[in-house]
């Protein structure tokens, strides 16, 4: 986005004090909070575009399920894409592929209800860290995929365990379609790049029926989410992803309990202020903390926001209070870094900091940085390049570029799903499709408009494809 007519004095609108010591300070905090919410909407984090992303990626999951699998697998787009909180090229696309021919059951759940073609596995969690388990074969189904069958190993007592390590490796050895470049395995995921610029992390998971875990979560006293949302989360169930607890002697055969679909439901139930609070925290992680190996991840920050939403009245989260809640969230993160403890929202016994890999020097640096940020008060958001750029820009061109960026992203989202619809069994797209052509034509028109305005404002314009990706980063 081009800057035009910058006003370097504008950041002085932001109060310098970290604490609100007077009515005037409170007014400044509230005014700055409202302006921050407006800026975040212009940057692509308004409710409408977030919902459009969620709808598009939910539809993509359904299309991939119908197109590729014939009922054998269910596809979900998870992570920030599924949550609607990152633009098209801003982060990797996380894809979860769940095997519909395998069901894993909690210790005391009966298996007789499942038809004969289903392979049934029993979870053994007593010797595993909270939120992890091993999987013992209870019944081999009449229809069993090679990647599952070849992942069984002996537990030393003549019983068959499903190895998480072997399961990922079996999927890593699959043949790739044209245009796909696979990268080195990253924990449970198999990263790859499609067509040079679409980065995806694919995780192959298994259904997990765990009514005891979910009923315990649902029974907690809470301000949020509402009862109907709690029941939807319970109905969405859980999955097991192929990754063990770091350092466990059973790590290669352990699986981690995850609630991806339920957590996306929870995120969709956050109000506008809570959602933007999560976005601000992710910006701070990326632009200020710069974690090297996910010692602090977006998942860490998401759990802080979910706990805050559950433990406080929903009405207290509004546009005028977002920076006060950012202060609270940063303090919660600082405490987690000091104590190396943060309970997992769905299974509080699991400590998300237990395997953070945080070394002492980095721990001290981050604690010091966050402490400084807490003393800065509302001015902390000036550390964020995207926010600062918007503050010093004139509103009119900012709104104009924001509108074009949002339209361009909507076109990409529609094109993404149309590509699946118009592709044959080899993945070749029918370029004569009228809707495909219309989307391409409108994309070119928007890019031409943006390029012309940038030239008029004295900016250097690269080729259209490079500009397209840069706008949606």
List where the protein language model places each region:
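Non-catalytic helical "accessory" subdomain of NTase-fold nucleotidyltransferases
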Residues: 1-473
